[in-house]
Amino acid sequence: MAYCIINCTTKNKEEAIYIAKSLVERKLIACCNIVPSITSVYEWDNELCCDEECLMVMKTKTELFNEVEIAIKELHTYDTPEIICIPINNGSREYLSWVNEQTK
């Protein structure tokens, strides 16, 4: 079984919690850590932006990535949310077993 971390940024903590709860309830992710304040610097519509955001760090099975991506896009307020999948090469056997049990 392959596992991954999915990162996603949101406009605030409330949106991150809303998305995380929905994904956990749907059994698409086992867990989401929410980092409440990060600073993102980027260009959007030819304008340099510097915004405070939240970072969601989600753990799941790699095979569920497409479903997670669809769900995030459905729930998210951004036009183009950051949705990045990072493979987990190694991890605690017990923890990854728990991730497996918590997801569909």
What residue ranges belong to the model's regions?
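Positively charged, small/polar-rich N-terminal and surface patches that mediate targeting and assembly
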Residues: 1-104
